[in-house]
Regions:
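Extended, highly charged accessory segments
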Residues: 1-130
Length: 130
């Protein structure tokens, strides 16, 4: 969620405060703070262990941070592939080992595998054509 929130404003030519971000769970219908994410093995890559629980159906929501919206979300939807590629390039180009505020967020807040997990999720989103 952090890298999407950092990269998206460049495409929409807006400030990062113009966009809100939330991680949600389809299973419970609730928003989840990043530190409280459940865990399970990922079906995409055996190298990543304990990413999400089987009962967790995650979503990342980027939304207009203005009452009624100003069209940022619909514009973002149209350029979602380019944004995901840019997010992957941002992660790959960051010299940190496990995560930092410039890419996936500080390791103390996101965990030691956050950079690896974010990269894996982005690759799979791009493969599925989201």
């Amino acid at each position: 969620a952090n890298v999407l929130h950092q990269v998206t404003p460049f495409f929409l030519m807006c400030d990062c405060h113009d966009l809100g971000v939330s991680i949600g769970d389809n299973f419970t219908g609730k928003s989840i703070p990043p530190r409280d994410l459940p865990s399970r093995k990922t079906p995409f890559n055996d190298r990543l262990e304990n990413v999400l629980s089987p009962d967790f159906s995650p979503n990342i929501f980027l939304y207009d941070n203005f009452p009624g919206g100003i069209g940022l979300s619909s514009a973002l939807f149209e350029m979602r592939q380019e944004v995901l590629v840019a997010c992957l390039q941002t992660i790959d180009g960051c010299p940190c080992e496990a995560g930092c505020p410039s890419c996936v967020g500080p390791v103390r807040e996101t965990g030691e595998k956050a950079k690896q997990v974010a990269r894996e999720l982005l690759e799979n989103l791009l493969l599925t054509g989201i």
